[in-house]
Amino acid sequence: MAAASKSLSFLKPLFVSLARPSSSSSSSLALSRARTIAIPNPLFSANSRSLSSVAFAQSTTENGGGGGGSRAIAPPQTPVVEELQRIDVNPPKGTRDFPPEEMRLRNWLFQNFREVSRLFGFEEVDFPVLESEALYIRKAGEEIREQLYCFEDRGNRRVALRPELTPSLARLVLQKGKSLSLPVKWYAVGQCWRYERMTRGRRREHYQWNMDIIGVPEVTAEAELISSIVTFFKRIGITASDVGFKVSSRKLLQEVLSHYSIHEDLFAKVCIIIDKIGKLPLDDIKKELKAVGVSTEAVEQILQVLSIKSLTTLEEIIGGAGEAIAELKQLFSLAEKFGYSEWVQFDASVVRGLAYYTGVVFEGFDRQGKLRAICGGGRYDQLLSTFGGDDVPACGFGFGDAVIVELLKDKGLLPELNLEVKNIVCALDPNLQGAAATVATILRDKGQSVDLVLENKPLKWVFKRAARINAERLILVGSSEWQRGTVGVKILATGEQNEIKLDELE
């Protein structure tokens, strides 16, 4: 197949032994200061005090054979000052650039999101980044409404950058209507925006992985969703000793409040406050509960119950006949069957901040307590009806990209993702640049990646370039070899070198 001896004379001067650089040098771009450009402009005086003086030529032309002469003055050149103002080279606060090294990490993360979703039989969907503001203010909760990036467009419509994906999914389900065959299993990876206080792993712009199941009323849906997240964690090296899931139920909280005679009209407000447990001092939680109308005695009783971490103990306090207790028992039983029981624990204080949750809720957390919620989700059986449709059983979760990257950093689990190009192709003569392009096309047509050297560069530069892009092979196009229909090929890892015919180049 590959012709040629391994000690070809033409290759000896070409494949010099060069040390690979340990790292690539960084470069920076500087913005120019204001600069002045002189352009012809007969409308302005050359000696105007508001402009720089500009020298211009005057020429005198005599008319031949006539009386008197005429002097032609060249129009003055008037300087126009281009103010190249210095701009902040950083992106807006809370947002990010993705240079190649960061983009490789993002692609790796998203690839894992998608592969896990497909393992569980989910199909990918996406939605507009810009949605009607009404989509989020109906049932999202007070916190989300305060964090919206919203404005009025030129058609006098109130719109918002999506702060999450679930309302858009609900809208799409309603749009498809009866053409959908339930149950639906969809996933999405999309950009979201929230104007919130930034902490580590929490930004104003982030990407979010969602998985949702529409049309299944049983708690088996929640159990499978948690299983998918556990599968993702295992794929990237996260263990049950690193991350856990706190599980509870909105129905359970309703039963607790009813047990202590708290009116159901206060439920939404109480949920928002309880969701702050662990984020605010307990005294602040008590003050907020009292401020919405919960009595001092009831506040103490509720907080005592919500501190319980045992489903059995809670069952003894409020009774075990409730629907919420039964669903949670089934969920923990399913966790054993799915094989992730060591990942989950009961925590009555988990309610999630979004107002549309109606049943089981869960939240992934960092066991070391360094980061806020890693992911979270639950059941939202009544969300579609708030948009004008019928009640449809549904549940799902959201998983942000920023916080998981911080967790991987803490655990030393960030992958090394270098640029990898299989071939680097270089012409040894500027006149052979077209031939090198032909070689690159042959390889690309066979599905191989190629970095084509587009300029006339010394071999030392080419070897350094090959090292930086982690190329496997260096392919050199020389004049005599090209006339024979061959190219020089060097395997960079071993130093093996050959002359190979074009039609045998694989």
Placement of each model-derived feature along the sequence:
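Positively charged, Gly/Ser-enriched RNA/tRNA-binding surfaces
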Residues: 2, 6-13, 47-71, 102-120, ...
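Active-site/ligand-binding surface loops and adjacent short beta/alpha elements
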Residues: 278
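Polyanion/phosphate-binding surface patch
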Residues: 79-84, 89, 93-94, 98, ...
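A charged helix-plus-loop insertion that forms the helical arch/lid used to bind
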Residues: 264-274, 285-292
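Short His/Asp/Glu-rich catalytic/ion-coordination signatures at enzyme active sites or charged loops
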Residues: 255-258, 266
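N-terminal chloroplast transit peptides
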Residues: 1-43
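Alpha-helical segments
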Residues: 57, 68-81, 88
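Glycine-rich, mobile lid/loop segments that gate access to catalytic sites or pores
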Residues: 244-255
